[in-house]
């Protein structure tokens, strides 16, 4: 089983698409009003780590992902848990500003590190704060120099300010650090901000055409270089298309990937902090392999591309911050992604038949913090 572990709600940034929205006058949907939030949830991990270890011992192969807030604000806890927990596989999702604080022996235990970057310096700093891009890139070079050999994923948040083609191309090839693993998530249907946005025009004129271009670029790289870039919104669905597999919610939330709150309660998703009516247990009394499932419901269950998309996002499915028509625009981006990948499928199969690439090139860590469907 996979578990996100919330260490702290504190963060050393106030990104425009995250904490800064707390200062905006946003609409509140009926679904959001129906959510019960546990206001007593501690700001930081407030239980004895030994309770966590006993819980994890009941899982023969747990994977633990450190999460926040910014988890590296509690580097002390990260180091302690990595050294003591009965876990072989660790991951972390971080803004990257404090990565240089981790000693080499701790770094070496992480199979995957997800670092938040949105594209070029100007875009990243506009979203996340002045100097963030340079500091993060410097820290990435530092941990590589210290011997870190695991997967580094550039995790982008995509908004109307993003030229998706330019941003992905930059992160894939630049003089600072070039990522072979990239994921992006669209900032859409997560808050009641649609009336403040120009989402429709951006999706139609920039994002959807850009995805078609990027899929072509992705397959071009396979043909010329004989390797498959780990661009996760393409990688995971294409692997399923090759094997003709259907998919549940691709991030695994609510059935394979759970979140441990700062008080030890267990929820289905790291975004659903404090949503107590969706808790499925507590680390002091639950078995990690016997947790209830929290599933996608409503309009997604009857969707024609459900087995491709999986439902996109459990939190959005429950809270529905955007209206029906607006949610349809988000679904349109997924349909565009699906059409682009299906159009590229014959070419990918030809490259496999010719021996340029092999099916195993699409293998990857499941539930690694990439939602897959943007």
Residue ranges and their predicted role:
Residues 27, 130-137, 141, 145-253, ...:
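Radical SAM enzyme [4Fe-4S]-AdoMet core and its adjacent flexible, acidic
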Residues 6-14, 70, 254, 300, ...:
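Cysteine-centered iron-sulfur cluster-binding motifs in ferredoxin-type domains/subunits
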Residues 1-47:
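Canonical Radical SAM [4Fe-4S] cluster-binding loop centered on the CxxxCxxC motif
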Residues 38-43, 125, 288-290:
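A short acidic, glycine-rich active-site loop
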Residues 49-65, 74-189:
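Radical SAM/AdoMet-radical enzyme domain recognition
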Residues 9, 22, 117-119, 186-190, ...:
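Short, small-residue-rich loop/turn micro-motifs
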Residues 271-374:
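Flexible mid-to-C-terminal extensions adjoining Fe-S/redox cofactors in radical SAM and related proteins
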């Amino acid at each position: 089983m996979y578990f996100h572990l919330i260490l702290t709600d504190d963060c050393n940034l106030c990104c425009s698409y995250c904490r800064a929205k707390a200062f905006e006058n946003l609409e509140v949907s009926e679904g959001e009003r129906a959510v019960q939030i546990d206001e007593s949830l501690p700001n930081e991990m407030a239980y004895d780590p030994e309770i966590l270890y006993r819980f994890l011992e009941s899982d023969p192969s747990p994977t633990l992902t450190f999460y926040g807030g910014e988890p590296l604000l509690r580097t002390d806890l990260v180091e302690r848990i990595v050294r003591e927990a009965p876990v072989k596989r660790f991951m972390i999702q971080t803004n990257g500003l404090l990565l240089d604080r981790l000693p080499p022996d701790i770094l070496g235990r992480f199979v995957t590190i997800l670092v938040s970057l949105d594209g070029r310096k100007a875009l990243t700093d506009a979203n996340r704060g002045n100097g963030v891009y340079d500091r993060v890139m410097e820290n990435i070079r530092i941990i590589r120099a210290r011997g870190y050999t695991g997967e580094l994923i550039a995790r982008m948040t995509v908004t109307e300010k993003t030229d998706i083609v330019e941003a992905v191309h930059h992160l894939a090839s630049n003089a600072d650090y070039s990522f072979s693993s990239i994921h992006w998530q669209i900032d859409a249907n997560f808050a009641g901000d649609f009336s403040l946005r120009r989402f429709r025009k951006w999706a139609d004129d920039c994002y959807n055409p850009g995805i078609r271009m990027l899929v072509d670029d992705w397959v071009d790289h396979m043909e010329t270089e004989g390797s498959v870039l780990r661009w996760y919104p393409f990688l995971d669905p294409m692997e399923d298309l090759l094997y003709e597999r259907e998919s549940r919610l691709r991030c695994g939330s609510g059935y394979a990937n759970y979140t441990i709150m700062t008080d030890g309660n267990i929820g289905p998703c790291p975004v659903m902090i404090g949503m107590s009516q969706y808790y499925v247990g507590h680390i002091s009394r639950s078995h990690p392999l016997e947790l209830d499932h929290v599933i996608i419901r409503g309009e997604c269950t009857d969707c024609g591309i459900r087995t491709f998309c999986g439902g996109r996002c459990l939190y959005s499915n429950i809270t529905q911050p955007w209206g029906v028509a607006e949610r349809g625009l988000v679904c349109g981006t997924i349909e565009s992604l699906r059409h682009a990948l299906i159009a590229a499928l014959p070419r990918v199969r030809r490259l496999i038949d010719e021996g340029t690439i092999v099916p195993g090139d699409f293998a990857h860590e499941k539930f690694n913090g990439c939602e897959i469907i943007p």
